[in-house]
Regions:
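Conserved Radical SAM active-site core
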Residues: 1-135, 143-174
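Auxiliary Fe-S-binding modules of radical SAM enzymes
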Residues: 131-132, 145-296
Length: 296
């Protein structure tokens, strides 16, 4: 615990909450929902602001605690109340105004849910969030994660390839607008969108210094860059080894490309990349970070 007292628990019941989609029987700490503004600037956690009092906001401003990472989801107050299942969630957006006026650096996040906050609602959210730039320095758009444990929860559907292409078109259009106005791309799509749409990853300069890396924005591009740089600094040799790399299904093709780059310098090393199917959480979960020991 990096705090002097207990963590503040979440007062929301978000329709997309991953903790609500976990199976029973795991360790107790995995079921704790935090929504603590102190963890935002200390550890980079995203907070909804519904748990922050006016006194908390003024303390952040007084001590200039930043950046504050805000989980927006929607800029439509009524829709935000619905998504967070909290009647105060819409009013909590007014706290963003106060942070903006005080010059507190912020990053934003939108967990996109099909048929809920995408399409016209996403367009409205991006339009409204753009007004906070460059104090709000970046916003990530990530697709909702859906496990097989959703009985009794809001009926959400996975995005299709066509959906992903439409989301990227919106984001790329806003990136161009924001770059021309502020010199930053501002809004960023997580890597999943590009993979799902079958489109190439953006070049490194489009990520504005990887401000949203922990949200899966630019992880694959950064990995590719780091592998190429590391290989370029080595002479290579003829050692014989067999290397097995386990990863999630989403990243597997990119990990294979990285292994091919390494193999050019180390031609006698045999690489095998194994894409792990997620049986624990369900096949819709394809990221490496949610692979469990039993699936390995």
């Amino acid at each position: 615990n990096g705090l002097m007292d207990d963590y503040r628990s979440c007062s929301n019941h978000c329709m997309f909450c991953f903790i609500d989609q976990m199976p029973p029987g795991m360790r107790e700490t995995l079921y704790f929902k935090d929504d603590d503004s102190r963890l935002s600037f200390l550890q980079g956690n995203y907070v909804t602001l519904t748990n922050m009092s006016q006194e908390d906001i003024e303390r952040v401003i007084k001590y200039h605690l930043s950046p504050i990472n805000v989980s927006f989801q929607a800029m439509n107050p009524k829709l935000r109340c619905k998504m967070l299942h909290n009647r105060f969630a819409g009013d909590a957006l007014k706290k963003v105004d106060r942070l903006y006026e005080a010059g507190i650096t912020m990053n934003g996040q939108i967990v996109l849910c099909k048929g809920v906050n995408d399409g016209e609602e996403l367009e409205y959210s991006l339009q409204e969030m753009a007004k906070y730039a460059p104090v709000l320095q970046s916003v990530s758009v990530v697709p909702v994660g859906l496990t097989k444990f959703r009985d009794g929860l809001y009926p959400l559907e996975p995005f299709t390839k066509e959906d992903a292409k439409a989301v990227l078109e919106q984001i790329h259009r806003w990136q161009k607008i924001m770059y021309e106005k502020h010199g930053i791309h501002f809004i960023h799509a997580s890597d999943e969108w590009y993979i799902l749409a079958g489109e190439k990853l953006p070049e490194e300069e489009r990520y504005d210094g990887y401000l949203q890396l922990e949200n899966g924005v630019g992880m694959l591009r950064l990995l590719d860059t780091e592998v190429r740089e590391a290989v370029a600094q080595r002479d290579g040799d003829d050692r014989k080894e067999r290397v097995t790399v386990a990863t999630g299904r989403l990243a597997a093709p990119y990990i294979k490309k990285c292994m091919e780059i390494i193999q050019k310098k180390y031609p006698k090393i045999t690489f095998e990349v194994i894409a792990i199917r997620n049986n624990f959480f369900g096949e819709k979960i394809t990221v490496s970070g949610l692979i469990t020991g039993q699936d390995l």
